[in-house]
Amino acid sequence: TPEEFLECCRVFQENGIDTPIGANRWWLETFVFAQAYADLYNGGTTEAEIAALNSGEAKYSDYMRPGFQFLQTLIDEGYVDAEKALVSEAIEGEGPDFLAGKTPIVMAYWGAANSETAYGKTDFEMQVVGFPSSRGQMPVIPITGWGVGANADHLEDALEVINVITSDEALQLYSETNRVISPSKNVKVDCVPSLRPLNNRIEEGVYVLGSNAGMKVEQWGNTCRIVRELLGGATVEQCMESFDRLQ
């Protein structure tokens, strides 16, 4: 939960780790999504809640506020270095301290479980877990999609290529080679040990989406941009006003 996560950070700091969370300007919105949408995606009322957001009956700011308040607490307590995060690229900003053991917590995509392709080879074991939420550790899943232009010169060829790339056979090969979390219900794979805590939650059907084409307000990019406003000194309520303007 958020409270348990804050307690972990407090203990880290008491034991000499000044900044427990390595952050950058791209990925802090993951904390927000986990808290904002834990109930929306896992409470059995997903369609109705999204319809209310799209119609304006409900406000995105009401969903986002707890996550932004949580980020503000991380900043105020010194668990995140806001000034550094605001100017840091993904992995480059926090990577060296993570490898050196100075920063125990970082945000990363699942592929970072194979850390040699992300942070570099580690001399410690790591675990990939979900983000803190009212429902416990929460996987945040950004959707990656494929698209073909309707007027493409080689439309049929392009569609055929996508069909091959996204086939069960291709996804099985990809998953087995990289030992990552399965991208398809039709593909079973033994992921690397560090991913198992996250994989277990996903197999239980517990997760939130970081992107959703069914929402009229684009999620990932807009939230990332407004998080940067917070890192730059805006108040939580000023950030909520930014969401209200989008809606």
Regions found by a protein language model. Give the residues of each.
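Paired acidic/hydrophobic, glycine-rich loop segments that form the ligand-binding mouth/hinge
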Residues: 104-109
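Glycine-centered hinge/linker elements that transmit conformational signals in sensory
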Residues: 9-11, 53-85
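Extracytoplasmic/periplasmic solute-binding protein
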Residues: 4-56, 103
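Short helix-initiation/N-cap motifs at beta->coil->alpha
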Residues: 2-6, 84-99
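Short, solvent-exposed loop/beta-turn-alpha elements that line the ligand-binding surface or hinge
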Residues: 40-66, 118-120, 130-139, 196, ...
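Conserved C-terminal helix/tail region of periplasmic/extracytoplasmic solute-binding proteins
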Residues: 16, 201-247
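Short helix-loop capping/hinge motifs at secondary-structure junctions, enriched
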Residues: 39, 43, 77-80, 151-158
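Extracytoplasmic/periplasmic substrate-recognition and gating elements
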Residues: 117-180
